[in-house]
Amino acid sequence: MKKNIALVMGGYSGEHDISIASGNQVYNQLDHSKYNVYKIVIDREGWYWERNGEHLPVDRSDFTVNDNGRKVCFDLAFIMVHGNPGENGVLQGYFDMLGIRYTTSGYYTSALTFQKGYCNPVVKSFGLVKVAKSVLLYKEPPTEAKLDELMEGMRYPVFVKPAAGGSSVATTKVKCREQLLSAIREAFTEDRQVLVEEFIPGREFDCGVMQFPRGSKYEGWNPDFKHKLVFPVTEIIPIGGHEFFDYEAKYDGFSNEVCPAEVDDSIAHHIQEVSYRLYDLLGCRGIVRFDYIYNTEEQELYFLEVNTIPGQSAESIVPKQARALGISPAELYEMSIQAALAQ
């Protein structure tokens, strides 16, 4: 019997449209002869099942839909909601209460990794990778008089970003004191907590990791990484005047993404090994991407963030990394489903 898959996309954050693009890519790659796939869209107006342009209601009391008089219960939720409520643990807690399996990390890991100000100290405590100095601000911007106190122990430039968010929305590179307060105010428009983080010069690298189901043909593919696929490392090179991998660089083509990265094998393997270990230490599940800066002067790797629901559009980083291993998007998502169903 075909399993019912809820492909959940959208969300309440500025990443809503990106999530829809990722969700549509996944929808087009799933095996519809094997699964009944339902597009479930979340937005500020409500939750609905999108069927041939119609918006049909979702019963949130038990996460079901009515398909021509037949109540449809779901065997699995394939979560593609970037930001709130998909990456912050809210949907995961909801599905846990309903007993519905899903393709991502659990609620606790999702909540922790989504909040950069809380995740960074935890990652630092593992001793695997360096973490930049930072200050976490709560509820409201500081006064002008407090800026120097805030920057004590840090030096410009700094990044100012929402503590919980993604796709570099409302993220600013601040080069001097005069720019700091306005950047903090902008970040507070996206979140109630804001992170001010010291800029680390260097090369940006990303590495995807995923678990695969037992019995997969990839068992034993690399003796260093048991029971997981650790993808080739990608280097992100902003172009067109972009100083970092901001929203436009990510989605409007203002970056070169080189995979496999043209870097010494020892550095690439170190990035893969750190990603592999962080995946377990943080309790990750599903497809996850880890982002880093390699400071060439210090020859040190710095942790940037974890993406527990990385983008899956045709040009997103993880699908490109998978293709570098000879894994098609269809195979990638099939492995994700099978691993989740086996939980």
Say what each PLM segment does:
Residues K2-M9, S13, K71, L112-R203, ...:
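Active-site nucleotide/adenylate-binding loops and adjacent lid/helix of ATP-dependent enzymes
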Residues M1-Y108, L112-Y118, V122-S125, Y138-E149:
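ATP-binding N-terminal substructure of ATP-dependent carboxylate-amine bond-forming enzymes
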Residues E257, A261-E262, S266-H269, E273, ...:
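Peripheral (often C-terminal) accessory segments that flank ATP-dependent C-N-forming ligase machineries
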Residues T172-E273, E300-Y302:
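Phosphate-binding site of ATP-dependent enzymes
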Residues V37, R101-Y102, K130-V131, V158, ...:
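Hydrophobic beta-strand scaffold residues
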Residues E198, Y279-Q312, A322:
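Conserved metal-phosphate-binding beta-hairpin within the catalytic cores
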Residues G83, S168, N307-Q321:
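Glycine-rich phosphate/pyrophosphate-binding beta-alpha loops
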